[in-house]
UniProtKB/Swiss-Prot annotation:
Uppermost EC category: lyase
Keyword Cell cycle carried by entry: no
Name of the featured protein: L-lysine cyclodeaminase
Effect of loss of the gene: Cells do not produce significant amounts of rapamycin. Cells supplemented by L-pipecolate restore levels of rapamycin.
Pathway: Antibiotic biosynthesis
GO CC list: cytoplasm
Family of the protein in this entry: Belongs to the ornithine cyclodeaminase/mu-crystallin family.
GO molecular function per UniProt: lyase activity
Lineage: Bacteria, Bacillati, Actinomycetota, Actinomycetes, Kitasatosporales
GO biological process, alphabetically ordered: antibiotic biosynthetic process
EC number(s) stated in the UniProt entry for this protein: 4.3.1.28
InterPro entries for the chain: NAD(P)-bd_dom_sf, ODC_Mu_crystall, ODC_N
Activity regulation description: Inhibited by nipecotic acid and thiazolidine-2-carboxylic acid.
Any Pfam family hit: OCD_Mu_crystall
Gene behind this protein: rapL
Length: 343
């Protein structure tokens, strides 16, 4: 069986021809529909991700994120989080690949670069949570962290909110200053500020930082708007948190992956608190979210392999429409399947 391979060139072509707005809108729609199915019990929650922590002079993690859709296939993302990549290697902080295995034969039917769609699906998932939990008509978005993930957070949230301005804060001034150029396509004013001002001013706030383990919080608990909605995105490994516990204590909290939430993410700080409704629960029953847009809410995002599965579906769909990707014989198909040397 041949494998369809989508490389950076193919993904760039999809974004160019289809347009990033259309692709992001499709992702938001499919993520919402998919998580609603998950909340209704029509598909299974993926297992928690696993992997290796890398210490020493080049810290980071390499993780494996699987999801199986029965009768369709298994999506497997291998992803690396390496916070020194930009300075040391001029590479993105998050790099990886995502593959699709046929559910019956186990053969790899697709393989794609995962850096862009990981950033886009993370934004799309946050947009779904924000649409459910943020005050309708929210106009001010604040971002703590001005890296690659901040770009897709701003893009995705601009598709579900009538944003009028973006506040950006980063401990690296050059990243904050360059952010406006990277999101110029949004045609929104961008103001560089500090974390406390961003927190006090925002209707919606996203934390997307590379804060080290034990280095949080990256924002103060107060002052803030009474209706503030927070998307906590960057707490993606054990011991890493971005939000102050005092903020979490006062908030309605929704998690993306209940099986992961206590090992990673902000819920690490709340060992005695019961998990509330998940994002899947809210998508399946939006009335659960209805009381919360006027009060403090937090979406605790650790990253879901189910969202990766959906994102790969969207990517493959656009690739098929445009005739993109190359078929390659990556896997062994010997002339005699009983003889591994008969290649």
């Amino acid at each position: 069986m041949q494998t369809k391979v989508l490389c950076q060139r193919d993904i760039k072509r999809i974004l160019s021809v289809v347009g990033r707005d259309v692709m992001m809108d499709r992702l938001i729609s499919e993520v919402h529909a998919g998580f609603a199915r998950l909340g209704r019990g029509e598909t299974d929650e993926p297992p928690p991700r696993t992997g290796f922590a890398r210490g020493g002079d080049v810290p980071g993690v390499i993780e494996f994120m699987p999801h199986r859709a029965s009768g369709i296939g298994v999506t497997m993302k291998t992803v690396s989080y390496s916070p020194q990549n930009f300075e040391r290697f001029n590479l993105p902080t998050i790099v990886g690949t995502v593959s699709r295995l046929d559910d019956d034969s186990g053969s790899m039917v697709a393989l794609a670069d995962a850096a862009t769609i990981t950033a886009m699906r993370t934004g799309a998932v946050a947009a779904v949570a924000t649409r459910l939990l943020a005050r309708p008509g929210s106009t001010t978005l604040a971002l703590i962290g001005a890296g690659a993930q901040a770009v897709t957070q701003a893009h995705a949230l601009s598709r579900v909110l009538p944003l009028e301005r973006i506040l950006i804060s980063d401990i690296k001034a050059e990243h904050a200053e360059s952010f406006a150029g990277r999101v110029a396509f949004l045609e929104l004013p961008v103001e560089v500020t500090d974390a406390a001002t961003a927190m006090a001013t925002a209707d919606v706030l996203c934390t997307v930082t590379s804060v080290p383990v034990g280095g949080g919080p990256v924002v103060p608990a107060e002052p803030r708007q009474a209706h503030l909605h927070v998307n906590g995105i960057g707490a993606d490994e054990q011991g890493k948190t971005e939000l102050p516990k005092a903020l979490l204590d006062d908030a309605f909290i929704c998690v993306d992956h209940p099986g992961q939430a206590r090992a990673e993410g902000e819920f690490q700080q709340l060992p005695d608190r019961e998990l509330g409704p998940s994002l899947a629960d809210l998508c399946a029953a939006p009335e659960i979210a209805a009381p919360h847009p006027e009060r403090l809410s937090v979406f605790d995002s650790t990253g879901s392999a189910f969202a990766d599965h959906i994102a790969l579906d969207v990517l493959l769909g656009f690739a098929d429409e445009l005739g993109l990707g190359h078929k390659m014989s990556i896997e062994s198909t010997p002339e005699d399947v009983l003889d591994p040397y008969s290649l």
